Swiss-Prot record:
Tetramer of two alpha and two beta chains. This is Tryptophan synthase alpha chain. Its EC number is 4.2.1.20. The keyword Disulfide bond does not apply. It comes from Pseudomonas paraeruginosa (strain DSM 24068 / PA7) (Pseudomonas aeruginosa (strain PA7)). The active site is at residues 49, 60. Gene3D superfamilies: Aldolase class I. It catalyses: (1S,2R)-1-C-(indol-3-yl)glycerol 3-phosphate + L-serine = D-glyceraldehyde 3-phosphate + L-tryptophan + H2O. NCBIfam families: trpA.
């Protein structure tokens, strides 16, 4: 079993959801970002999504757009992001790590080179927001052939007739974007989330992670009662932006992760 399969299977046995945390590689700088990454599992993160900075993150809201800018201005590159994963893996062989971002930087890096180096670094999965199933040959198939899960996004506007196409070839887990729009937008109602999870379960046996708009331990707990994973990104990123210095940024992000983890673990 892959690290993602193992983690979700274990959590299912424990009757709780996964806390999935998103941070942008290189934000606020390389060293602090690596420190955050290394600290997340002990703070309570079950799965980590690491953003690959890009100049035009069109699906992301203001908080993550600014994180991309901070990271890129600090010199973060895709090669450095893969190095960061290797450094993380040197001390953690258990926590699943997923790279999330856009196809353009991967295309420029070279798909074959990227997939090979990502696998060697210890990447478990990919979420590429601007690569629909019609382009599976571009990255999904090469990644899965190398043993890297390819995680699809579904949204409130993904109809029943479209879902099988989106889910075909998906692996790892399904990421349900509970609000149509950019990341960090207002949270969806729990009733809406419950209906969406039920609809997705009719189409897939994969674990379902819910993201976009989750900001507090209470909200995380409420979503954790309905889904297999609770994805939090913008709320963590905002702590970095407000911190003022890197040491405070590390401390504040890990503190919020701890609060969210407590909410998720006490949910059921």
């Amino acid at each position: 079993m892959s690290r993602l399969q193992t983690r979700f299977a274990q959590l299912k046995q424990d009757n709780r959801a996964a806390l999935v945390t998103f941070v942008t590689a290189g934000d606020p700088d390389y060293d602090a970002s690596l420190e955050i990454l290394k600290g997340l599992p002990a703070a309570g993160a079950d799965v980590i999504e690491l953003g690959m900075p890009f100049t035009d993150p069109m699906a992301d809201g203001p908080a993550i757009q600014l994180a991309n800018i901070r990271a890129l201005q600090g010199g973060q590159t895709l090669a450095k992001t893969l190095r960061m994963v290797r450094e993380f893996r040197a001390g953690d062989s258990d926590t699943p790590l997923v790279l999330m971002g856009y196809f353009n930087p991967i295309h420029h890096y070279g798909v074959e080179r990227f997939v090979t180096e990502a696998k060697e670094a210890g990447v478990d999965g990919l979420i590429v927001v601007d690569l629909p199933p019609e382009h599976n040959e571009d990255l999904c198939h090469p990644a899965q052939a190398a043993g890297i899960d390819f995680i699809r996004l579904t949204t409130p506007t993904t109809g029943d007739e479209r879902l099988p196409t989106v889910l075909e070839g998906s692996s790892g887990f399904v990421y349900y974007v509970s609000v149509a729009g950019v990341t960090g937008a207002n949270a969806a109602t729990l009733e809406h989330v419950e209906e969406a999870v039920a609809r997705l379960r009719r189409h897939t046996d994969l674990p379902i992670g819910i993201g976009f708009g989750i900001r507090s331990a209470e909200h995380a707990a409420a979503v954790a009662r309905l889904a297999d994973g609770v994805v939090v990104g913008s709320a963590l990123i905002e702590r970095i932006a407000k911190a003022g210095d890197t040491a405070r940024a590390v401390k504040d992000v890990l503190a919020l992760c701890g609060e969210l983890a407590e909410g998720v673990r006490n949910a059921r």
